[in-house]
């Protein structure tokens, strides 16, 4: 369970770092002013190439980030404006976007563990101390059952390996 949690945290960090690199490229591009946009003829050619397919849109965004430093910003301004608008909606701050997901994941995990503990506690409360001791003696013979009894509770372990308790 710990290794799964560790892998999940590493995956979330990896994604957030990779998204952070992409966000820096988009954030560095200045947002174009609608009053300074070029003539409609240049807009129609740039918008048709950007909307033809997703691959051409990604190519135009790459060329927009490359050509924003050069003098030819007329073709890239319309494609970068659509790219920056979508970037503002999806990834304004990737680090802030992943932190609530981690908190939610931890909260969900805590609630699941609490529900399991309460369910095991209620099931164990239905048995007498002698009956629970009898279940644990049977479960001690199987190492996997004994390990599960330590983590999930004796009644859940006995039920998983031997079926419902006979009493």
Swiss-Prot record:
Residues 19-118 form a propeptide. Residues 38-87 have a biased composition (Low complexity). Ca(2+) 3 binds at residue 133. Residues 131-163 form the Gla domain. It is found in: Secreted. Ca(2+) 1 binds at residue 140. Ca(2+) 2 binds at residues 137, 140. Residues 28-99 are annotated as: Disordered. Residues 1-18 form the signal peptide. One of its GO terms (molecular function) is calcium ion binding. Disulfide bonds join 139-145. Its main location: secreted. The keyword Nucleotide-binding does not apply. This is Osteocalcin 2a. It comes from Oncorhynchus mykiss (Rainbow trout).
